[in-house]
Amino acid sequence: IAEQLRRRHRMRRVMHLSAEQFTNDFISSVGNSGITAFRRRYREVDALLIDDVQFLGAKKATLREMLYTVETLASAGRPLLFSGLQAPSEIAGLSQELAGRMASGLVCPIQPLDIDIRRQILERWIADRCPLEVPASLLDQINPMLAGDGRVVSGVANMINTLQRMFGR
């Protein structure tokens, strides 16, 4: 998504990070008296994408800073994207204000990939990443063994790429 925002929408300053990275950066900036630079770094972006927002629960100072950052960007019409294991309203410790801001957009539960979609993604990623063609029969054997989300499929494509480069076949 971050790459698409950069390419299609010509957004140069797209910030994509985990909630843990945001928290660590915030804590570090407070300790080093760099809160102004922190705020500038996060509030002057074209788009903000934060993964694993469930990590934010019960971190009061970080939640407050995240809320102010979200409000600043939302009022400027900047795209915001949050991902997490739960809906914002279900994250323990997340303030109602921030959960409400997150839920004011589109909240979409992500289901595990079905076998056909997983196969299509695997084929595409292997075609994009691997120097050599991978036989369809091998993909037929691998695909049913995969479970979970796109990260698992990406890992398999990376493994095939690495093995091809190591062994040249």
Q: Which residue stretches match the model-derived regions?
A:
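Conserved alpha-helical scaffold flanking the Walker A/P-loop in AAA+ ATPase domains
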Residues: 7-8, 25-50, 56-72, 125-128
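Short regulatory helix/loop adjacent to the ATP-binding pocket of P-loop NTPases
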Residues: 27-31, 88-104
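Conserved AAA+ ATPase "sensor/coupling" helix adjacent to the nucleotide-binding pocket
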Residues: 86, 105, 117-132, 159-163
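Sensor-1/coupling segment of RecA-like P-loop NTPase cores
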Residues: 68-69, 73-96
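Conserved AAA+ ATPase "SRH/arginine-finger" region at the nucleotide-binding site
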Residues: 90-92, 105-117
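Walker A/P-loop
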Residues: 1-15
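C-terminal helical "lid" of AAA+/P-loop NTPase domains
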Residues: 123-127, 137-145, 151-166
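Structural recognition of the conserved hydrophobic beta-strand(s) that form the central parallel beta-sheet
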Residues: 16-17, 49-51, 79-86, 109
